[in-house]
Amino acid sequence: MKKDIHPDYHFIDVKMTDGTVVKMRSTWGNEGDQLALDIDPSAHPAWTGGSSRLMDTGGRVSKFKKKYEGLGF
């Protein structure tokens, strides 16, 4: 096996939407960095049975609704 071809695999903190922090191994960022999620399994309609609403973090849902408001969806 070739040496030094694989990315660094280290521990990071993943902050869920409810504020809980989970320690995971990843190639993202550096050791000890924190990745904040916009949506996770506890808040995603695919895993909650559609009971939860999607968060409009970037204004995309609002922009879509405004663009197609006259069609009566």
Curated annotation (Swiss-Prot):
One of its GO terms (biological process) is translation. Keywords: Ribonucleoprotein, Ribosomal protein, RNA-binding, rRNA-binding. One of its GO terms (cellular component) is ribonucleoprotein complex. The keyword Amino-acid biosynthesis does not apply. GO terms for molecular function: rRNA binding; structural constituent of ribosome. InterPro entries: Ribosomal_bL28/bL31-like_sf, Ribosomal_bL31, Ribosomal_bL31_A, Ribosomal_bL31_sf. Pfam families: Ribosomal_L31. Part of the 50S ribosomal subunit. Binds the 23S rRNA. Belongs to the bacterial ribosomal protein bL31 family. Type A subfamily. This is Large ribosomal subunit protein bL31. The gene is rpmE.
